[in-house]
From Swiss-Prot:
Residues 12-129 form the Response regulatory domain. CDD domains: REC_typeA_ARR (cd17581). It comes from the Eukaryota. Disruption phenotype: Dwarf, narrow leaf, low tillering, abnormal hull, viviparous and low fertility phenotype. This is Two-component response regulator ORR3. InterPro entries: ARR-like (IPR045279), CheY-like_superfamily (IPR011006), Sig_transdc_resp-reg_receiver (IPR001789). Functions as a response regulator involved in His-to-Asp phosphorelay signal transduction system. Phosphorylation of the Asp residue in the receiver domain activates the ability of the protein to promote the transcription of target genes. Type-A response regulators seem to act as negative regulators of the cytokinin signaling.
Length: 131
């Protein structure tokens, strides 16, 4: 009698960025680390995805986006009883200590400075998803 082990499903990351280039970069970095990635181009679309798929293990979002900033998305996620446990990581090309502190105080797990590197992704995933 043999027992089959069912592989663990890949952790699911929602990547949010209005830049197609940045979405592609972060998506490739995450996929190369064996994560399932859904990419969207706005905070509004991210909330739509989250309303349909509760199996998201982490959100990584750009800070500066039109309509809804990454900070606004962070606040909406952390205010939601259903979503507040999902870790949110913000990223920006601007290294603004005030902005970074504000995001961390609002509940962000981390704040990455672009360009995001493979070492950032592995550190993040080990610290945030695997905890």
């Amino acid at each position: 009698m043999s027992t089959k082990t069912v592989p663990e499903p890949e952790p699911h990351v929602l990547a949010v960025d209005d830049s197609i280039v940045d979405r592609t970069v972060i998506s490739r970095l995450l996929r190369s680390s064996k994560y399932r990635v859904t990419t969207v181009d706005s905070g509004k679309r991210a909330l739509e995805v989250l309303s349909l798929d509760r199996n998201v293990h982490m959100i990584i979002t750009d800070y500066c986006m039109p309509e809804m900033t990454g900070f606004d998305l962070l606040k909406r996620v952390k205010e939601s009883a259903e979503l507040k446990e999902i870790p949110v990581v913000l990223m920006s090309s601007e290294n603004s200590p005030t902005r970074i502190r504000r995001c961390l105080e609002e509940g962000a797990e981390d704040f990455l400075i672009k360009p995001v590197r493979p070492s950032d992704v592995s550190r993040l995933c080990n610290r945030v998803i695997m905890k």
